[in-house]
């Protein structure tokens, strides 16, 4: 044994050929701080081997290395920048020593080689992959860029243009695509990966493969003329500005880093990468995007626990077809859970099946599923005008019209048809679950299961716990949502649950802003371009449906009269009374036409101003800062109240629900990450300016206390000193 560490070992696989195997105790290999230190120690041990002729790197798991340990990132970002820069120098010295070892080196890649794992294999002379390999540098998706030589070695290996595409998109390449780009030198079967790798290394040792010229290429400047460089980098920067925009600086920073180091050798180029990596770690964007990743892991870990605690759902039913019912049925069937779709109208069943067929056809056209698979999914959706076979279903999702009396009647009816262990779930968006449960004999088997529209695109499912809902029911519905490929978050019952409860104060802020003379187009522009929402409030209301919003607004006002009761007629009333329902009937705040792809196209409607004029007496200019504040304060206050009341369990789950359910700007990380970033005192000062506007602008006492105690919503990252490498 040449070296034995906790996460890797090195020994000879054949005379003269050393084999470094990543073999962490867990299910995957991560290039965490401890493993990186072990890599350095192992390489030091290899340098002392007089009989060494070649080095092979591999993993004993189904993935090579899934990346760095992201749980360590926020702690690293928090250390002084000089210390972080020094540590990066030490880490890169390890990869440089791997690259400079005076024998040929090869990485045998199975499964994921991402982030630091990819940077590790880039430091070897050759890379051989099996068919399962997936190789990439996803750092820009976390608001940073490669920091262990990835932005230096990859452009020199495969060329600037393809390297910039790999780095700026953050999307990994499958084995065959990586081979076409030159990221790997061959693709072989998993069974022969190690033996083929040894054979390839022997060829390099014997001089049949020129490993030294390959190494020289990676350490030299890019082979670009000044004109080629100017064209390449200018085109890349233009595309990045269009793709990523101003809110996500990492892709542009990565391109500029590659550009500025293009004519440098490896060591000088690594200095440029170091400087840019450190700068990105200090941005709120990086902290927010890393925070989202960690929050997502928390939510998934809770779902995994629920899956362990429950039996998998093997058959389901949906009550109420149409577009929503069809979407739920499609999602269930496409993930392997057969579904009965029941409705009282044949026309609705036809619409539901049409929706499922349409979604499957799109998958077929894009090559994401075969005709055979499409037929199998469609055949596992059974449309029915009666309850035949429903007694065998594990779970029944009710998705009928959003009316409490209708829903209660349908739920009571179906409860008599199902077996006593079956779970009933309502897809209501606003009606309290405990209210609907009053019509049931077994309320412990009932909960909310709120999907978002369109079902196939929106990742969030709110699983709502009523007063009498059992934990067993919650666990099984969370497990079913996970089976469907969704992200379930458990919410305690209240009108609107979490997402809609916090959305309607935001709409109230919009109505008040229009009442006070704001311009809806400017508001949309500010909330989209400046704050970062995918849609401004007027456009969002059009997409949701102004009739739907009008009804939900009344439900919310009844549930929270002290804050959400309207003080007179507002713009949503005015639009509703004018039959301006939004995209669904072609006219809302905007007018809609159908483009060549069959999608609604937004156009300015000159008549909208006249309708808005009926609920305002003035026109008044507002700054972007005033608009953002007036729009966001009501939502932020309501989010805080939901946490205070235990409607949502943690800041992490609240932020994920906002990002996944509403499209809250990921670069801001969610409401609680945003509050921590700007500072609670700063928020209180901002809110104080608008407290005269009414109850939705009154900040909860809890945030005042937190600010007084100098606290944050998220715990401070674990303190790390610059690790020794």
Swiss-Prot record:
Q: Which reaction does it catalyse?
A: a (3S)-3-hydroxyacyl-CoA + NAD(+) = a 3-oxoacyl-CoA + NADH + H(+); a (3S)-3-hydroxyacyl-CoA = a (2E)-enoyl-CoA + H2O; a 4-saturated-(3S)-3-hydroxyacyl-CoA = a (3E)-enoyl-CoA + H2O; (3S)-3-hydroxybutanoyl-CoA = (3R)-3-hydroxybutanoyl-CoA
GO molecular function, a single term: long-chain-3-hydroxyacyl-CoA dehydrogenase activity
- Give the residues the record marks as binding NAD(+): 324, 343, 400-402, 407, 429, 453
Query: What superkingdom heads the lineage?
Result: Bacteria
Q: Report residue spans for region: Enoyl-CoA hydratase/isomerase.
A: 1-189
S-S bridge residues = none
Q: What are the site positions for Important for catalytic activity?
A: 119, 139
Q: What is its EC number?
A: 4.2.1.17, 5.1.2.3, 5.3.3.8, 1.1.1.35
- Kindly give the InterPro entries that the UniProt entry links to this protein: 3-OHacyl-CoA_DH_CS (IPR006180), 3-OHacyl-CoA_DH_NAD-bd (IPR006176), 3HC_DH_C (IPR006108), 6-PGluconate_DH-like_C_sf (IPR008927), ClpP/crotonase-like_dom_sf (IPR029045), Enoyl-CoA_hyd/isom_CS (IPR018376), Enoyl-CoA_hydra/iso (IPR001753), FA_oxidation_alpha_subunit (IPR050136)
Annotated substrate binding lies at 296, 500, 660
Query: Is NAD given among the entry's keywords?
Result: yes
The catalytic site is made up of: 450 (for 3-hydroxyacyl-coa dehydrogenase activity)
Instruction: Show the segment(s) annotated as 3-hydroxyacyl-CoA dehydrogenase.
Output: 311-725
Q: Which Pfam families match?
A: 3HCDH, 3HCDH_N, ECH_1
Give the GO terms filed under biological process for this record.
fatty acid beta-oxidation
The function of this protein is:
Involved in the aerobic and anaerobic degradation of long-chain fatty acids via beta-oxidation cycle. Catalyzes the formation of 3-oxoacyl-CoA from enoyl-CoA via L-3-hydroxyacyl-CoA. It can also use D-3-hydroxyacyl-CoA and cis-3-enoyl-CoA as substrate.
Subunit field text: Heterotetramer of two alpha chains (FadB) and two beta chains (FadA).
- Similarity remark: In the N-terminal section; belongs to the enoyl-CoA hydratase/isomerase family.
The record, for HAMAP family, names:
FadB
Q: Which PANTHER family match?
A: TRIFUNCTIONAL ENZYME SUBUNIT ALPHA, TRIFUNCTIONAL ENZYME SUBUNIT ALPHA, MITOCHONDRIAL
Name this polypeptide is given = Fatty acid oxidation complex subunit alpha
